[in-house]
Amino acid sequence: MKHLHRFFSSDASGGIILIIAAALAMLMANMGATSGWYHDFLETPVQLRVGALEINKNMLLWINDALMAVFFLLIGLEVKRELMQGSLASLRQAAFPVIAAIGGMIVPALLYLAFNYSDPVTREGWAIPAATDIAFALGVLALLGSRVPLALKIFLMALAIIDDLGAIIIIALFYTSDLSIVSLGVAAFAIAVLALLNLCGVRRTGVYILVGAVLWTAVLKSGVHATLAGVIVGFFIPLKEKHGRSPAKRLEHVLHPWVAYLILPLFAFANAGVSLQGVTMDGLTSMLPLGIIAGLLIGKPLGISLFCWLALRFKLAHLPQGTTYQQIMAVGILCGIGFTMSIFIASLAFGNIDPELINWAKLGILIGSLLSAVVGYSWLRARLNAPA
């Protein structure tokens, strides 16, 4: 029990469980005895009916649309906390990670487009390498223990949170299907109710969650991706403390283990099971996986390092105290671990086009993320051991 408690207390535990879930999915998807069960599980129909309202989806879509909305709720809470009280609370504090995140989104997307611009279908996946898996990246960073400066960890967290916020905006603007005006109207009404609750000082989290469930259903039916409802709810839950209690912080504390140890591993298990049957060298070296691998492994660190250098060169920001530029470059490589967020965007980009494209995209994401984890860990370990 002592070892188990120590494991779950470690920052690396979430990343390790993610790796195990993804490896298990790959194993089950490629073994004759389990591949059928794995795919049957994902295709299991699950129906929810409340009066005249009916939602009928398979298990995979419930995981991607409903459970991931809880993950995005946590992201919304974290972004709000950082903007109001944390490392993004002032322009001076926020400048360096914000500039780094912008570079870390623009350059990977451009590099992906350099490989795929001529193909109007695969071009739709331009945002795939722009994402960072915060849990995985922090998990790899935690493997280096107390040698990692606290300022470097805070920089990675702030960068990844801004990256997630960018991914949310990208999903809302570029990966939205045909819109239902009626459902959008219901969603707008639900948002107005959330705003009113916040303005009136309502601090019962359950009320926000109840209205959030209505918002999630309306957004799901509207054509906008339902996970965005989670972020919106997170922004409206009160953060200010009263009698020593903050509803937003309390909910964040409650959600964190559920997201880290259940929701994200379940998402990884449901989405990382890529069948290797029929995989050829020609396929692996096609523009789609190559663009993703290049975007994650080269584009991410290049964009972050370049934009950080420009920020320092023109005195727009300063290095976090106790860190070096070489360490920032290593963190840039770790940000190439796209994994869950990249897979999520790939499912939106190609989900209604061709399942085979999703498979090739997932392979590119898995290879690019794994290489980024290994190279980033090795580079940062060498930089931390290097004399100052």
Curated annotation (Swiss-Prot):
Coiled coil: none
Single GO MF annotation: sodium:proton antiporter activity
Pfam families: Na_H_antiport_1
GO biological process: regulation of pH
Cellular component, GO annotation: plasma membrane
InterPro entries, per the entry: Na/H_antiporter_dom_sf, NhaA
Transmembrane segments: 14-34, 59-79, 95-115, 125-145, 154-174, 179-199, 219-239, 254-274, 292-312, 328-348, 360-380
UniProt keywords, alphabetically: Antiport, Cell inner membrane, Cell membrane, Ion transport, Membrane, Sodium, Sodium transport, Transmembrane, Transmembrane helix, Transport
HAMAP family in the cross-refs: NhaA (MF_01844)
Similarity field: Belongs to the NhaA Na(+)/H(+) (TC 2.A.33) antiporter family.
The protein's role, per its UniProt record: Na(+)/H(+) antiporter that extrudes sodium in exchange for external protons.
Protein's name according to its UniProt entry: Na(+)/H(+) antiporter NhaA
Species for this entry: Salmonella paratyphi A (strain ATCC 9150 / SARB42)
Gene: nhaA
